Amino acid sequence: MELILLEKVSNLGNLGDRVRVRPGYGRNYLLPYGKAKMATEENIRYFEERRAELEKAAREAEQAAQARLEQLQELTLTIKAKVGEQGKLFGSVGPADIAEAAEQAGVELARREVRMPEGPIRVAGEYDVQVSLYTDVEGTVKVVVEGDAS
């Protein structure tokens, strides 16, 4: 399946690249999420007419993501959670909790932008959590999980 990318896609290509992908990847991810269009003559012509507009929108989105990352890196997100003996949490702190703490601190952060490859936090302490805000805009956020023994 041959597609034209409408934005930068990790491990695939940049805006405007014509790429060959497996049909399932194209049909189930790239096309429905608006990241690509089929590489027909009509779509190629349409894309070339709008290329400057799309590149400008992509640049603005990347700059906005970079600004949000700088704000997040300046913050220390503090999350209070109930703990038992030995500092273990009742439940866990996951991406949704971290995104909510960022929202309360005044910085927009979606749950899907938080990367926790080791899984949710289950012990009170200080953690560096990865965030991926745009294709090449990634960093870490300091998260402190405080125990609330009540």
From Swiss-Prot:
The keyword RNA-binding applies. PROSITE patterns: RIBOSOMAL_L9. GO terms for molecular function: rRNA binding; structural constituent of ribosome. GO terms for biological process: translation. The lineage of its organism: Bacteria, Pseudomonadati, Pseudomonadota, Gammaproteobacteria, Chromatiales. Binds to the 23S rRNA. This is Large ribosomal subunit protein bL9. The gene is rplI. Belongs to the bacterial ribosomal protein bL9 family. Keywords: Ribonucleoprotein, Ribosomal protein, RNA-binding, rRNA-binding. The keyword Ion transport does not apply. One of its GO terms (cellular component) is ribosome. InterPro entries: Ribosomal_bL9, Ribosomal_bL9/RNase_H1_N, Ribosomal_bL9_bac/chp, Ribosomal_bL9_C, Ribosomal_bL9_C_sf, Ribosomal_bL9_N, Ribosomal_bL9_N_sf.
